[in-house]
Amino acid sequence: MIPLTLAPVGTAGTICKVMGNSDVRRHLEDMGFIAGTDITVISSLGENLIVNVKNVRIAISQETARRIMMI
């Protein structure tokens, strides 16, 4: 299990845990970051990551990406 920030570009895996307080977790779950969901790191642009989750590309900050654990 690693935080999304440590996954190299092109890595595909499965979200295993979303960390943070209940408001943060709810916000991320509303965006599609749910345990058991497949995720792929598409690119890293400065302080942001672009990921593919549920067939949607989403840009998230490094701070947010640290809260998402994947295997």
Predicted ranges, named:
Residues M1-I71:
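Compact, glycine-rich, soluble single-domain proteins
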